C-alpha cells in the first residue's frame, strides 16, 4: 500500500512555553547572507540627478566636491509578483557601514563590513523578494536615512547552499555587483533548513548526517537509530553476539573468533567435537580423552638410521634396526668409523656408544663440522667489528681507530673537519670542534635554530644566525607578536551589545531581542507568523514558541501528531483509533489513524476497507500525489512555474513581473534620462534619445557616448557619434549586454521532475515531493521514522511507502490485528479467544481438541467448581483426578499442618489450634515460632507407630540417618515426614491402599528419625509393606529425586517381622499322651516304648548338631571377609557385618519355602550403590516378642541390648 509520509515529533503544552521563557535556544535555523562586491558611480550622482555633495561645474556639468560616501541597506521579504517597497521587511533588514566612495571593489578581500547577515528561525520558503539600496551617508547632518543613489529589486528563488550566487544591478545612475546565499545553521538541513540531525556516538545512536540531513551510520553500526552493532564478519548468528562493532562474544560451550567451534570435553587432546563437550578422536588416536597414540610410528618416527618402526600398542612401538645399528631407536652405530664421519681433518675413534671425533684446531662438533668462533669473546676494541676466520679473526675498525685490534688512536684534526669553528682538538678515539656563536654540530656546520616558540599568536619565526625575527599575522604586533590590536576600542556594538575583541576583528554579543553584526536589529520572531494549522505564536527574547492544537506537533505545528507512538491506542477501524484523553467525559477521544496522510480524509467502508477523500491539489489512492498545477504552462515571457499545493507561482525573468510574468517592467519609471532626454522602455533596459548635444546612455555627457557603466557584464563600448554600440562578452547580448544568451537551466540539470529556476549566473532546483539534493537525485527515505506497526516491514518508494505486515496483522500500517475468530471456528458452545496469527478455543466441560470437537467423559464437581474429565488437582498431600464424573484421590494421611506461633490460630482451621513443637521435635535447630495444628482432643493412638512395638504385614518401621550439614535450618521432624509423604512410590501405593506415615526423633542419636508406614490389611497374599521397603532402599541408594532431604540421607535401617519357627514337640507329646491313656494297661510295654523314644530324641539331636555345624562352616567362610564394623549382642552373640563393593545381597533366612526366600533375595538385590563406600549389611537378629526395642547407634559400635525379637537389616553409607 502507498502512504503519505508522516513524521513524529514530541508534543508541547503551555507549561513548555513558560519553560522556554527561561531557556536559551537557537535564534534561527539559518541565515540569509548578502555581500557587496563592487560599486561604480561614474559621476558621483544621486538617483534624482543631484550631486552627492555640492553643485555641478557649469562648464562640464560634473560634480565639483568630494565623492559619495556609499553604504547599502537591504530589505528581505516574501516573494512578490509585483515588487513594492511598501510594507515591512518580513524576513529581515540590515545595512553596512560606509564602504567607499564613487567607485570601490571588495573582491579578493575578507572584510566583514561588506557582508549583511539576516538570521531566520522559520522554514525557509526558497522564493523571496530582495530590495537593495545604495545610499549616500550625509557627513554634515549624520542623518540615519541617507540619500538614495540606486535601488535594485530582485525576486527569485534560492536553495540553501554554501556556494554564492552572483547578481548585478545596472541602474541608470550606478552599477553595483553583489552575491547572496542561504546557509542552514549547524545540525539543520533541507530546502527549508527545518530538518534537524545532530551526529552522535553514544548509547542512543552512532551516526553522522549526510548533506541532506539523513542519518548515516558509523562503520560497524546499523538499524534505524544506528544503535545495533555489526558483529565480526562470519560471526555465528546462532552461537555468537556482540555489543560493539567487530566483536563476537560466544555463548556457553562455543569458542573461536567466529563462535562456530564447539568446546571439546576438558582434557581432550587429539579430538574434536560437533556439539559442546564432545571428544571425537582424530585418526590414529584413541582413549576417552583421545590421548592414546594408536600410530606412534607415524606421528613421531622414532626409529633412526633407517630402522623400521612397528606399532605394538597405544603409545608403544618397536624398532627393527638396519645392519650396523642397535639401540631402542637404532641410535647406536656398530663400526661407525668405517664411513669416515669426522670432517675437516678430524680423527675418528670407535666407542661403545658409536664413535668419537678428535677435531683439528679451529673445529668442533660431533663430526668436527663446526668452525670454532674465534670472535667469542670479541677481540676487537673500541667498537670494532670482528670477522671470524678458520683458527683466526680479522677486525674492521670504526673511524678514529686503527691497528690489528683497533687499539691505536688516529688524529682526525689533520683533515680539518671543523667548518665554523675557532679550533679543533684531537681526543682519544674522537675529536672536538669549538664552534663560533650560532653554530653547532660535530663539525660546527649546523646553524642553531633560534626559533624556539618565541613568536606568539600564530606569528611566523624566521631564523637568523645567532638570532630570529617574528612575522606577525593581522591583528597582532610587537617583537614577539604579543600585542593584540583592540578593535573594540571604538565601541562599535549598539543597543547595549558587549564587544568581544578577536584576532583582526571583533564580535558583538547582543542582548536579548537584538541581533545583527552590530546588534542593530530588533526582530519580532512572530512576524510573519511561523506557526501553522491555527497555532498561536509567542514571541520570546531570542526565539518563538508555537502552542500547537491537539492533533499537531513540531516546532511550527506543521506535522500531524501520531498519538499511538507514545500511548496505547484502540483500533476502531482502518480510519479511526481511540486514545486516552481528559477532554471528554468518556475518557477517550477518537482521532484519525493518518492512513490517508496529511492531505486526505479517511472514510471507513464495510469489511474493514476504506477510501480517502483528498484535499484540493492532491490525488491518488492515499492522497500522496500533488496535482501539477503547472501542466498548462501559465507563466509567460520565459517565467518559471513552481508547483505548489493547489496553486502555482511564476518566477519571472529579469525585466518582467506580474502573476504570469505578463508585465514588462517600466525601466523608464524612474526617469533615467537626464537633460530632457526622451526615455524609451525596453525589456530589462531603456534607451535615452538625447537632445541639445548631450551624449551617453543617460544623456549625461558632452564629451562621449561611452563611459564605464554604459555596457554591462564586461561589454566594450564604442562611440559612434550620435549613438554608441556595445560589443558584449561571451554569453551576453542586448543593447547594453544585459541579456544572457544561454540560460543556466539549459539543458535542464534538475532530475526526477524537478523544476529549474535561473538565479543570476547559477540555478536552483525545486524538487517534487519525495526527492531531495541539489539536482533532485536523492530519493527521500519515507520509511524514516519507521511507520509500520507490529514488526511490519517498510518498503520505500518515490514519495510513498508500503508496509508488508507480519503474519496475523493487516491494514495499511499493519495496525489491525486480524481477528481469526470472525469465522467462528470454535464449536459446541466454546468461546473463541483471538491471538496473534491464530486463535484459542475455551472448551466447555466434556469437550476437548483444538476446536472443541472431541467428546470426553462426564465432568466432576470439586470444591464447588466444575472440573473436566481427566483433570488432576492437589488436595493437601493427595492428588485427585476426575474420571468420568467420579473423583478418585490418593489415600495418604497428610499429618498436622505447620503453623506460626503468635498469629491468630497460626493459619490453622477453625477446629484446630497452633501448638508449639517440642524441643526434641526440632530436627535442624533453631526452629523459631514453629508449631503444628492439632484439635483440642488428641486422636486415638494407632497400633502402628514409630514409638510402639507393634508390627505385622501392614506395618513397617524404618530408621533414617541424615547428614544435617546438608539440610536447611528450622526443619522439624514433621517437615521431614511431610516430605516423605510426597515420594512418588508412596503416592503410587496410596492409590490402592490407605497409607499413614508417622515420624518420631531417635532418643539415642540426634541425626536419626524413626518412621512407621502402615496400610490397611493386604487384600492378597503378598504384603505391600515388603514391596515398599525394597523400593525405599533402592530410591535412597541411588539418590533418585531432587529432594534435599533424600540427598541428605546417609543410612537406612529396615525392621521386619520375625518368621515363626516350626515346633514339632507339642503335637508329638499330645500323641504320646493319648497313646498312654489308650494303652494304660500295657505299662511295661509303654515303658519300653518310652525308653526307645528317648533314644530317638538323642539321635535327632545329633543330626541337628551336624546341620548346625554345616551352617557354621558357611558362616566361617563369610567371616573371612574383612569387616570394618563389628557389633556384639547383649548376650555375647556376635553379629557379623558384610560389605559389598557395588551391591547389597541381603539374605533373610527364614523357615519358609525356598521359592519365597529366593524371591525376597531378588528384591533386596535391587539396592545397588554406585558410589563408595558401599552399604554394609548387618545380619538380622531375632529377639523375643512383646518387648520394647532399644535402638543401636551404628556410628559408635556399642553393643546391642536385649530387645524384642525382630529381623534387622542395617545399611551404612
Swiss-Prot record:
Every VWFC domain range: 860-914
Keyword Repressor on entry: no
Keyword Transit peptide belongs to the record: no
Secretion signal span: 1-26
Domain of life: Eukaryota
Domain DSL stretches: 182-226
Listed name of the protein: Protein jagged-1b
Native source species: Danio rerio
Lineage, broadest ranks: Eukaryota, Metazoa, Chordata, Craniata, Vertebrata
